[in-house]
């Protein structure tokens, strides 16, 4: 396997995440604009006017850009669907990710490449063949085992199933990130409880809450599996990535458009390193374990292998929110950067800063710049071991950063 044969697709919900994905070695990014995507109600969403900048930034780095248009589409939204896809084509988008035939058919009609979303629950080669009329890449159902994925891949090859480009249909699979309790993300719980549809990009994440099962006859409350009975742990394939790509997967999709730029950078870096090790013949259980430890330092709900190993029941999270071994704390913002001497002037706003702490700068152009704080100075140049909130300080940086960047530390 050559590293160039496998595509790492990174989630992008902000310009900071876009820069981080590019820094880390992503081959492609996916994102949403407006209300026609599965993160439309999230803060991690762009507007139609952002399209040009996102595509241009990605392409300048040799990275493909995919637009998610993967919600259910209603009749009164047809014009919006056309406007979004028209704009995407005009700005040079590489493909849209869709599930509704209104989006799929219109995109193909005007010559835009289509990838079929996991919402379509593709679970066999006949369905792949059906969608190959319009799509060059399909995301198979997350509930499949690796053996089932391999069977589908064999059928694609043996039956010469090709997409509109004339090439064999590519298999894309989720490799890392959050999993939903429902089949291929088709959930009604949020709509039922809060009138916010998960299938319209407005999931209220009710499955992540703690629940108790009550015996209505006795009133006894049963504490089941830590009570997070609807919340699966996060998918992680880094410790069986050789078998994962060996099943025929060619696009590794990372979940997490609503997660931070530091998450995007760390996850892409780790999977890129694992792929390069597989290529070089140096991929070992010890290396994979080390990568998994690094993955655990950013947002996660604990890890399991998903359904790929054939387990019918999910491993449930033991945490509300993140189980990361480290958490980020906002320190302050960069008020100036002196490029010649690589020193940032930082206004410490929210938490004190001390020598020896692991820190990172984050910005739309900077992406993520991590370092250990080796030295710290007052603005008059006096060395300091720590600085308190409300003060200005000088920090020597390992890489160029920018005015307006945010500074965080890991604790």
Annotate each PLM feature.
Residues 44-50, 79-83:
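Charged helix-capping and loop-helix junction motifs
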Residues 123-128:
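Short, glycine/polar-rich helix-capping loops at beta-to-alpha or helix-loop-helix junctions
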Residues 81-117:
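Well-ordered mid-protein domain cores that form the structural environment of catalytic cofactors
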Residues 1-24, 28-40, 55, 61-71, ...:
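Surface-exposed amphipathic alpha-helical tracts and adjacent flexible/coil segments at the periphery
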Residues 132:
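Positively charged, amphipathic and often flexible ligand-engagement surfaces
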Residues 14, 71, 99-102, 120-122:
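Short glycine-enriched loops at secondary-structure junctions
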């Amino acid at each position: 396997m050559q590293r160039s044969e496998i595509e790492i697709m990174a989630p992008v919900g902000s310009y900071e995440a876009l820069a981080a994905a590019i820094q880390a070695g992503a081959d492609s990014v996916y994102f949403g604009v407006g209300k026609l995507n599965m993160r439309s109600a999230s803060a991690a969403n762009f507007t139609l006017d952002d399209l040009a900048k996102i595509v241009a930034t990605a392409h300048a780095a040799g990275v493909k850009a995919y637009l998610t248009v993967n919600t259910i589409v209603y009749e009164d939204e047809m014009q919006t669907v056309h406007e979004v896809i028209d704009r995407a084509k005009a700005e040079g988008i590489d493909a849209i990710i869709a599930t509704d035939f209104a989006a799929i058919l219109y995109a193909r009609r005007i010559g835009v490449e289509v990838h079929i979303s996991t919402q379509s629950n593709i679970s066999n080669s006949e369905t792949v063949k059906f969608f190959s009329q319009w799509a060059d890449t399909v995301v198979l159902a997350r509930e499949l085992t690796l053996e089932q994925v391999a069977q589908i891949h064999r059928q694609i090859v043996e039956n010469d199933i090709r997409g509109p480009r004339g090439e064999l249909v590519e298999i894309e699979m989720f490799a890392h990130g959050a999993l939903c309790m429902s089949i291929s993300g088709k959930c009604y719980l949020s709509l039922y409880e809060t009138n916010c549809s998960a299938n319209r990009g407005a999931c209220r994440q009710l499955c992540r809450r703690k629940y108790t099962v009550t015996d209505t006859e006795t009133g006894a409350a049963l504490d089941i599996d830590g009570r997070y009975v609807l919340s699966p742990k996060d998918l992680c394939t880094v410790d069986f990535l050789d078998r994962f790509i060996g099943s025929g997967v060619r696009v590794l999709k990372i979940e997490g458009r609503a997660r931070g730029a530091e998450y995007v950078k760390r996850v892409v870096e780790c999977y890129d390193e694992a792929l390069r090790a597989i290529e070089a013949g140096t991929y070992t259980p010890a290396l994979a374990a080390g990568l998994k430890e690094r993955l655990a330092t950013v947002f996660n709900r604990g890890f399991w292998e998903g359904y790929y190993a054939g387990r019918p029941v999910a491993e449930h999270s033991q945490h509300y929110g993140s189980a990361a071994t480290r958490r980020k704390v906002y320190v302050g913002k960069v008020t100036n950067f002196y490029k010649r001497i690589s020193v940032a002037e930082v206004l410490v706003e929210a938490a004190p800063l001390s020598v020896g702490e692991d820190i990172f700068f984050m910005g739309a152009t900077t992406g993520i710049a991590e370092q250990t704080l080796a030295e710290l100075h007052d603005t008059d140049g006096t060395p300091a071991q720590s600085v308190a909130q409300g003060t200005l300080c000088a920090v020597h940086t390992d890489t160029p950063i920018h005015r307006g960047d945010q500074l965080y530390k890991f604790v």
